[in-house]
Regions:
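Contiguous, well-ordered alpha-helical segments that form the cores/surfaces of helical PPI scaffolds
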Residues: 191, 460-473, 493, 645
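Conserved catalytic cores of very large enzyme subunits
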Residues: 22, 27-456, 477, 481-642
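N-terminal amphipathic/hydrophobic targeting modules at extreme N-termini
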Residues: 2-3, 8
Length: 679
């Protein structure tokens, strides 16, 4: 008998003896175990969550922090979602502990009370099992040029050519995204892509874009442009793939495009590792070709990311780069979906879907860490303004005998009440900031140690939600009128003043704050429902709190009025973190009409805007159009999916939560006929 035969006989003998003993066990015999799994409340709640998820119509209707960046239900999402309540409890316990350490005379449990009373909301506190993680970032890619992703724990060294750049770039996106709760902006992506194009084909490659570089036996000859587009396809389709490290969501990626003055202001003194400087002509060509390619590619597959922003400088009554301005309007005419950021100075960069980041520096000197791109929000806490206003009213005004009518004499009392809450939130942010530094010092935030981002350059953000409803409760109309304008100015300027007052850049761990109208994709629904359930006033004409200065379901507010309401008389210099003006249209306009709108926006100080026209896709033949249709013009099918933005990124409406799908039906999509856009 061989050793193999002997082992085989021994195996079956042991199994046979075990099964014989097992067979002698009576079915009704009581077997003692250390755990009563069946009656364990923790286990029962988790199983109940799984059952709810299985029965839900889509992922957004079953998850803790729903968003539309998920395309189907699967076990990977369950794995990410099932422990979110536990993550939240851990996060809150850590913040309370740090509050006690930093502020021994402050009642740290007030943090829990403010959260559970829905006065404030801590964004993405459930996203990480480690409970503490930064929110979003705009990175510098310079460390990527020097060391690849080794500093992130990867194996890839610095890229040497265009092919390796594209591959390692995708790896970098997934590696960094896995360590942030929100978006990762790579504003230098096309700048560095252009750098490697020059290495591949020479400095004048863009002038020879139709030059044939390969003649395959089977297939069309490949030109420089075709090869470039192939690399873009690799990058874009890769970053749109779901990632296990993000709960089966794709990475939330933002790209920026620059006009010439913005490029010169941001990168005028920038040098690549080999001592060369970027030039405007080649980058401009790459930017335009990429935008045209990406817009056309969305007729093949509706791609969600990157979220794109074009920056335009407007000064002395005109756009300084007229060529880029004209190109932007042409792209809008052709159905391209992107944001436009208008500024009169190169002191800020809009890198997320609504956030205006004032840059701490524009110096590009990697050795001392002064990288102007590095910014973002490391923590976001949002105020439920509608509830806060009503709590103030109940305390200060409800006992008045005469009928209450809000006027400017009440602002002192209101701002005093709101300031007390703001002051507490600074403490909460301070505690969270120190917890982030604890993670940083323990080596758990490698993106920072590797130099992609500096924790001291990121903001602690105070968000606002429920602005419209707060104003309506006080008897105001949310249209362009002096009373509502003053209300916005008073509220926003209070936050800005307090942000400056509490700013600390002298300590080792900097505290810098900003305020913004947060997107509130799921929070807007939550706050509305919380307030309604708790007996606070909520309007009947909507089912959520929107993130705009105007009400997106108000048919009486025109496109130009919406622009003014996101301009200098409402936001201006008062709201230091910004807000995005979403203009919903029923069809795309002409380039001339878009020029009129952008010019009007620039003159009225509306810094950040975009246009939303629903896209449509036939379920049967796959035909895609950049405007809605009920019947497919190609095959005649009526099985149609619509795509639009909730706030920042383009997704299938069927993937939205039920509440957001309902809200979509109430949006006013403006119909504009004439070249001259009237009120």
């Amino acid at each position: 008998m061989t050793i193999l035969q002997y082992n085989s006989h021994l195996y079956y003998y042991i199994i046979g003896e075990f099964m014989s003993e097992f067979d002698n066990t009576k079915d009704n015999e009581i077997i003692e175990t250390n755990d009563d799994f069946e009656n364990d409340e923790f286990v029962k709640n988790k199983i109940a969550f799984i059952e709810r998820y299985k029965a839900a119509s889509n992922t957004a209707n079953a998850t803790i922090d729903d968003n539309s960046n998920v395309f189907n239900k699967n076990i990977a999402i369950i794995n990410s979602e099932i422990h979110k309540k536990d993550n939240t409890r851990i996060s809150r316990a850590m913040v309370i502990s740090k509050l006690k350490e930093l502020y021994p005379n402050f009642n740290a449990k007030r943090y829990i009370r403010d959260l559970e009373d829905h006065v404030i909301y801590k964004h993405d506190e459930s996203s990480f099992a480690g409970a503490i993680a930064p929110y979003c970032t705009s990175i510098t890619m310079y460390p990527f040029l020097m060391d690849g992703i080794k500093g992130l724990g990867g194996l890839s060294a610095s890229p040497k050519n265009l092919k390796s750049f594209c591959g390692i770039f995708c790896n970098m996106i997934f590696a960094i995204s896995s360590q942030f709760a929100g978006a990762v902006a790579v504003s230098e992506a096309l700048l560095y892509f252009t750098y490697f194009c020059k290495k591949e084909w020479g400095d004048d490659f863009y002038k020879r874009s139709d030059e044939i570089i390969e003649r395959p036996r089977n297939g069309e000859p490949r030109t420089i442009l075709k090869e470039i587009q192939q690399y873009w396809q690799q990058i874009i389709y890769t970053i749109n793939q779901p990632a296990a490290a993000r709960g089966f969501q794709s990475a939330f990626v933002n790209f920026s495009y620059f006009d010439k003055p913005f490029f010169e202001g941001m990168f005028g003194e920038f040098y690549f590792p080999d001592g060369t400087k970027p030039d405007w002509e080649s980058l401009s060509w790459i930017q335009k070709e990429f935008m045209k390619w990406f817009n056309a590619e969305r007729l093949k597959t509706i791609l969600t990311f990157p979220v794109e922003t074009v920056t335009l400088l407007y000064k002395d009554g005109k756009f300084l780069d007229e060529d880029m301005y004209n190109f932007v309007c042409d792209e809008y005419e052709h159905g391209h979906s992107f944001f436009t950021y208008i500024s009169d100075t190169v002191d800020s960069l809009s890198s997320c879907c609504r956030l205006k980041n004032k840059l701490q520096t524009k110096e590009f000197n990697f050795t001392n860490g002064n990288i102007g791109i590095q910014t973002g929000s490391k923590s976001v806490i949002t105020f439920n303004l509608n509830r806060i206003i009503q709590l103030w009213y109940r305390k200060e005004c409800e006992r008045q005998d005469e009928k209450f009518e809000f006027d400017e004499t009440y602002y002192t009392s209101l701002k005093k009440y709101l300031t007390k809450i703001i002051d507490r939130v600074y403490k909460y942010h301070h505690a969270y900031n120190e917890l982030l530094w604890d993670m940083h010092d323990a080596g758990l935030l490698p993106a920072y140690k590797a130099g992609f981002i500096n924790l001291n350059k990121q903001y602690l953000t105070l968000g606002i939600n429920g602005l419209n409803q707060a104003a309506e409760f006080l008897g105001m109309k949310c249209n362009d009128n002096p009373k509502y304008s003053q209300f916005c100015q008073e509220i926003f300027s209070l936050f800005k003043e307090q942000n400056e007052l509490h700013k600390d850049t002298n300590s080792k761990h900097h505290l810098i704050f900003n305020t913004e109208q947060v997107p509130a994709e799921s929070l807007g629904v939550k706050n509305y429902n919380f307030d309604k359930q708790d007996g606070f006033w909520t309007p009947d004409d909507t089912n959520l709190y929107a993130s705009y200065i105007f009400k997106p379901n108000d048919p009486t507010v025109s496109v130009l009025e919406k622009i003014r309401m996101h301009g200098k008389n409402y936001i201006g210099e008062y709201l230091d973190g910004g807000a995005a003006c979403h203009l919903n249209l029923d069809s795309h306009l002409s380039s001339k009409q878009y020029k009129h709108i952008l010019e009007y926006a620039a003159k009225n100080g509306c810094n950040y805007l975009t246009f939303n026209v629903p896209n449509a896709e036939c379920q049967d033949c796959g035909f895609i159009a950049k405007q809605p249709f009920d019947k497919c013009p190609k095959c005649g099918s009526t099985h149609v999916d619509l795509y639009d933005r909730i706030i920042g990124y383009l997704t299938k409406i069927k993937n939205w939560s039920d509440a957001r799908q309902k809200e979509f039906t109430t949006r006013i999509h403006h119909h504009i006929k004439d070249d001259n856009i009237d009120e």
